[in-house]
């Protein structure tokens, strides 16, 4: 008897219909005619001196538009890949799309009118989405609360745990490299120095400890002074450091931020003024220190004069997290996607400074944007170098926001919240782009890939998810953890993702 297959389900029919209509769209003939296109820089809103071009509809593909734009900007010999948006960052043209099928045929524009296409440069390298667990390593005896990759490459990752230890993992072999003991309470924060030569840790015992990540040995004495637990750590940007004297900022529930001379083993200065728990500290590339607090404010300090510059007010509840548009380049200093390390100290300093200035310069000015995430379910975008007034307030989350982060190229902003969602925003003006829906529990943390094309998120639902930033769709679902995932990091070289949580296992993910 011949095998009989069951009839297709409604879902299969729907998918088949969608696929056939998609194929029909792609094969439909592009009519004769042309369209006028104006290119506008998405970052500055300026069209520079670029002329309006009349382009045949049949030739108006993203590939050809890339070639045209590079020629107009005299970059033919050293082409940059660009992404194009129509009217707002919500309508990105796909890498293989054309203006006719993306805009004219759906009725978004008429071929008779001038079409404004915003452009944003993309990374010249491409990161692949992690899709499998390469290693699940046991060792910690309690919840894993923090993980961070070395800025140098993805071969080493540090983790901090409720078992009072800091561990460094060899991600190439999936084995532990060092176990650092000394803390007498939960380790809540770990942070590599920008040149990857030192590792800082802090937590419930109110002490900051500095470690040599190559040997696993402690450097100097514990840094003592805080009267309550430490909430976050941030190193002074490499290009601002005095040679051989790196400094570290630590924030605490005691309401203060302390700046430490880690080699001298002493406090440099203390910043007090908050009336509640200081939840996060960031050290900007111009020397400003940014702090958020449960007193509903953000304070901006000058690290040179050790004084308060601004108090930023606007949130109606605790401020849980901060992010700077330059976080990625400050974290990685002179390390970039090429893997080439400058030979001399002067060259390292120059490269770190030029990477920061390139990332922060808009219209010839250094612009460092700040995003603040609050318990009041909103995010506020600021330009704190020039004004204490907010650029915009972003609303949409239904519950408190845990985490906020900028993409490495500074064009996108992602927020993770207790409403089970990650939301994506334009980092220029705060416009809402996408809601990333798939998690079924609160999302604790999110991080971008080095090329800004992908985002990973970790949740109470025990999973990691990887998202495509162009479409806002989920690219990979990564189950494996047996309990909540608290900590997540994507290596600066884009090769690996590290995660940890309540199941006490460090997991290393890769393509």
Q: What role is predicted for each listed range?
A:
Residues 165, 207, 227, 256, ...:
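A conserved positional marker within WD40/Gbeta-like beta-propeller blades
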Residues 2-46, 54-145, 154-155, 327-368:
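Intrinsically disordered, low-complexity acidic/Ser/Thr/Pro-rich linker and tail segments
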Residues 159-163, 201-205, 213, 250-254, ...:
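Conserved strand-to-loop turn within each blade of WD40 beta-propeller repeats
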Residues 148-154, 173, 190-197, 215, ...:
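Loop/turn segments within WD40 beta-propeller blades
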Residues 137-144, 181-187, 223-230, 272-278, ...:
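WD40/WD-repeat beta-propeller blade N-cap
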Residues 132-135, 175-178, 217-221, 266-269, ...:
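A structural motif specific to WD40 beta-propellers
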Residues 147, 166-169, 190, 202, ...:
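WD40-repeat beta-propellers
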Residues 425-431, 439, 449-450, 456-511:
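C-terminal interaction modules of eukaryotic adaptor/scaffold proteins
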């Amino acid at each position: 008897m011949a095998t009989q297959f069951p009839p297709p389900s409604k879902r299969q029919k729907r998918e088949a219909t969608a696929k056939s209509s998609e194929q029909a769209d792609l094969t439909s003939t592009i009519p004769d005619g042309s369209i006028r296109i104006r290119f506008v820089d998405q970052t500055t809103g300026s069209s520079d001196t670029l002329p309006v071009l009349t382009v045949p509809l049949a030739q108006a593909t993203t590939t050809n538009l890339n070639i045209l734009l590079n020629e107009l900007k005299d970059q033919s010999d050293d082409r940059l890949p660009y992404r194009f948006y129509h009217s707002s960052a919500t309508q990105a043209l796909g890498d293989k799309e054309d203006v006719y099928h993306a805009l004219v045929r759906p009725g978004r524009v008429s071929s008779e009118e001038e079409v404004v296409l915003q452009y944003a440069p993309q990374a010249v390298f491409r990161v692949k989405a992690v899709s499998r667990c390469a290693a699940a390593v046991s060792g910690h005896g309690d919840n894993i609360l923090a993980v961070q990759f070395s800025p140098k490459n993805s071969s080493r990752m540090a983790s901090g745990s409720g078992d009072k230890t800091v561990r460094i993992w060899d991600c190439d072999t999936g084995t532990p490299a060092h176990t650092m003991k000394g803390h007498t309470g939960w380790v809540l924060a770990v942070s590599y120095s920008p040149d990857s030569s030192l590792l800082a840790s802090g937590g419930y015992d109110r002490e900051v400890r500095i470690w040599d990540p190559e040997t696993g040995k402690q450097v100097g004495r514990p840094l003592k002074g805080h009267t309550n637990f430490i909430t976050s750590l941030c190193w002074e940007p490499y290009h601002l450091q005095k040679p051989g004297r790196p400094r570290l900022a630590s924030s605490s529930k005691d309401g203060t931020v302390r700046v430490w001379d880690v080699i001298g083993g002493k406090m440099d200065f203390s910043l007090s003024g908050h009336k509640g728990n200081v939840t996060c500290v960031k050290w900007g590339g111009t020397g400003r220190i940014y702090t958020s607090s449960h007193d509903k404010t953000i304070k901006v300090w000058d690290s040179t004069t050790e004084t308060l510059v601004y108090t930023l007010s606007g949130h109606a509840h605790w401020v849980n997290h901060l992010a700077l548009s330059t976080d990625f380049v400050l974290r990685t200093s002179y390390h970039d996607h090429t893997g080439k390390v400058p030979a001399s100290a002067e060259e390292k300093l120059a490269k770190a400074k030029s990477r920061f200035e390139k990332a922060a310069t808009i219209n010839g000015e250094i612009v460092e944007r700040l995003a603040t995430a609050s318990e009041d379910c909103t995010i506020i975008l600021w330009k704190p170098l020039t004004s204490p007034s907010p650029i915009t307030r972003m609303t949409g989350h239904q519950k408190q926001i845990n985490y906020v982060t900028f993409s490495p190229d500074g064009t996108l902003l992602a927020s993770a919240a207790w409403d089970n969602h990650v939301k994506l925003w334009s980092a220029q003006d705060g416009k809402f782009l996408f809601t990333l829906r798939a998690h079924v529990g609160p999302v604790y943390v999110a991080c971008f890939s080095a090329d800004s094309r992908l985002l990973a998120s970790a949740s109470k639902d025990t999973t990691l998810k990887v998202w495509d930033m162009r479409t806002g769709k989920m690219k990979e679902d990564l189950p494996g953890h047996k309990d909540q995932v608290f900590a997540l990091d994507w290596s600066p070289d884009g090769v690996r993702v590290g995660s940890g949580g309540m199941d006490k296992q460090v997991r290393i993910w890769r393509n």
